[in-house]
Amino acid sequence: MIVADRLNTTTSMVWFPDYENGVGDNDAPRSGTHRAIDMYRYVRDLVSTTNQDGPRTLSEAVEPIRSWVDRDREVNLKFVEMCIIDAYTTDRRQVDDDIDAQTVVILDAILTQDGTGLDSNGAQYYRDVVRTFHDRHIEHAKAIAENKRLVPLYVAMYSNWSNTSAPTRATMDIEAIRGRYTVSVPESMERPMVILFNDLTISEDLVVFATHGELIKYDTRYPPSSDAALAAMSSRRARKGGERDKRISLYMVRRGIYSPGMNYDIAHVHQTPGVGYVITVISNNAPTVDVPRSLVTALGMGGDDDQVVVSDVGGGVTYTASFVLNDITFVTEYLQHYTLLKCTDKATCIFVDETHLMKYARDWRRYTIASPRFIYEYNNFTVKFSATVESTRRDVARVSPYCRIRIYDAPNTQIMYGMANDITAHMIEYKSRERSIASLYAENLHNDQLLRINVRIMRDSKRVKREPGYLARQHRQVRRKLQAQKTGTNADVRSLIGVNNYARQCARLPTAVFDVDDVPEAKEHITYQLPNDRGTLYVYCDHDDAPYPGVVTNRLAGNKTEYPTVPCCYRLRRNANGDPDEGRTQSFYNTQRILNTQAFGKCPANLESVLMCQRYMSRDEVDAAGMETYFPKQSVVGDATAVRGGVNAGPNAAIEAVMRAVHAIKGRDSDPRRLVITTDRLADERSEMVSLLTCASQELFDMSATERNAWLNDTVSYFDPLRLVKLLQFHFDVNVYVYVRGARVKPVKSVRTTENGGVMLRFFEEYEQAWTDNDDVLVVPHHYAGADYHDLKVHESSVVIYVHSGTEISNLTYPHVEYIIFKRHRLVVPMIGKIYQRLLPKSMRNVYSFVYFDVVEDEDERDSLTVDEANALRILFYLSSGKSVSTEWSGKVSTTLNAPTTQTIDGIGRMVGVGGRALESMYSTEPLPSLAVDNHDHSMYYFDDNVKRKRLMNPEHSAKCQYAWYLNKLARVLLHLTAYTILKKGTLMSDLFLVDDVRFNRLHDSINTLFETGVVDMDSYGNLLIAEEERVLAIPSTRHVAWCTMHR
């Protein structure tokens, strides 16, 4: 018997094999037979004064649930006593009043089983229990309400138990029918003569024509043509007597995405003169009732169906059906091993259909944990079934996981329903005896002898193929070994300490004994006190790599109140009486599960292949940002060059990931796992980014200013790192590289370093060349409108974050974000930066790398910005106050790159197009951010139809454009600064950017070009310059007006 808190529910919810409860079609979950009760309500109703059998004694109340009471007799008997007292006193309004004498006598008779009615407990005892009724009732109600996974099951169980009518059996979902029929029709009738019912490939909202080995799929929104239907038919061939053989499959439509049940329609194909073959569909002719009669109806359309004869050619009809067991996630490997242990000469055996496993391995889908097909011997019939964990997919989130049992090729409905009940009983019995079963085989799950039995299904749906063998012989060997362990004195600690996810919290499990004399002499041991005075355990470690016992804080289990700490084995000695030093633990996961904040995990393979180790692991340089003090040991990570760190799941996971990554690169002792980050702190950090929202206007080009502010101010909405990566960069003063798992793009095949220090990337031509169904691809995210952002030179430090959705069983509301660190961090991230740049579109790299540029005609008279001027502008526009900017970087001259000559923006400062020209030489400086402007009516710039739109990178976006200008020397900078000033109604600091009259007049040709083309309105521009003369140009206004007049 197992208390249901092992299933993430409450202690009052008990799986109870002795109690059978049927669930009807209208209940939730929809189908299946359940054995479970709410023990509190069950006992109260059993002993209630309204019970037709009269009051029950304590022994009578305990008898139906004796197996549960015996698990902890003292505690559970006290629980039953309180239920009985509550049943007799819940109608009292004043619980502080004395219990009347008659009630005391009745309660004593029930609890003490004493018919004389002597007051054994006394009124005070009952009064104390009654006073706690309200608190206990509220606690029980809250516990049930907090049960997120089994509330529907609880409601169905109690409502059915309270119903006095006979239990009803739920209807199973029929998914496929196999059969073969011969149809005889007169020669004059143009009708198919043989119709086959074959297996179906169940897929959401698909219509399937199934033939001997072919599947033709198409969306239900586009009905099949006659050609498509005829293509699914085998070719006609002549038969004796002039008869012809034609085949067509059953036309089936899956309606709805929440139920896998099939509604059956029969398709009728006939030839019409002048038209050809026509498909007619007869709805609501379900062949589950009378297949021959349904076919006769279909084939006899428009004629006398008495001449149509349908007969079975042999083999019978087989059914494929499924049913939902409940909302619990059953791990199929446990079910398989458990049934193997029970397999004897007289018991039902379940084996694995390895042929089917290997044949259809690639058909397993994401978001579903699929099992191999099991071979089940039932009433001399051999039938196959599978157990899968499914859930409704909504974007990256999965909701309401449930277990679906699918039965294949049942010969009739009686066998099908009998198997369903038998399989359900197997699974519920497994859950009921989970602790005792675990003590038999849990320690052997990693044993090669057990794994060689078949294919093990991992929790993250990764298949590990093991060497097959003679199943029967291996089963006997495993059972003998497990039976020998069962009779020994040593026990698996998980069978004694009821903690969920024990193995995930402790990589090396200890061995527990009840007598200190059973501890081997050469082993150290600790004493562990079980709760509720259930005894003392002596725990030691039987691992060569982790010989020292200790305790670890219980962070994952639902019953951590009862077990705040659990024993574990460690490589080094540690204080067994206190919480372990979290910085010294080596929690490392090889799967893609969501990590806790104290764990590291393996990075996906693509990130490793892109880096190609880069020889940085063997370089002699000393990395000041090395992480040797807390980076997982080489023996743990193997050849991995990077690890990912855990972050709390939530809408602001991206912010926390960057915070932990920044903390990690501060120094050798900056362990990111020690950083305490609360929800309030994340909300504060997010609120501070509102002032920097302008810098993300390119990525948020499809949102208005109001929508942007509302999104960022809503601290419980998802902070999308793909669109808000610039905010993270500017706020934390680091370069942020974002990798995403799961994108269907061509992955990088290799990385080669060029002579000038750059990189060349080679890509796989086809997706299937590089990855199988079980692998994921890491890619650089593509922002909206294709304008990826990269700015390596603004920030001195760099971090890497990783966006993914965990494993198939992760129930996430938002995509999760984690950080990635390298043991030699500063030696790796420059290479990532080069790869990142290389992945960006070339035209975008030119724009963002060389926003300010100029043709260097004369080195003595250069009209480009200097590095100091660029840094000053960066301080003014780019960074929040208090951020320092490095002055060590200097621009480089390049003779091979193209520079943008035309940039197109819209009214809210987003760039939607760019054109370029080749330059002989170029001097690059830092870019300005997108314009921080509000919606406005003032139009200083005009879009000229004469602009050559074909030169824009994104011509389809030019229709959205409200403003455009040519970029020519410093004129572009002046326009940018002036527009920024007037639209934000602010001022520029003249000591940061000075332009005198001599330099301004030197550019009059370029500015005059802007006026002549009509891109810039000269009056508006002149007025703006006059208004800013003291702060920007520092020239007399009369000269400025005269200059504007001169160029009219």
Swiss-Prot record:
The keyword Lyase does not apply. Belongs to the ascovirus HvAV ORF146 family. Keywords: Virion. GO terms for cellular component: virion component. It holds the Pfam family DUF5757. It is found in: Virion. It comes from the Viruses. InterPro entries: DUF5757. This is Putative structural protein ORF84. It comes from Spodoptera frugiperda ascovirus 1a.
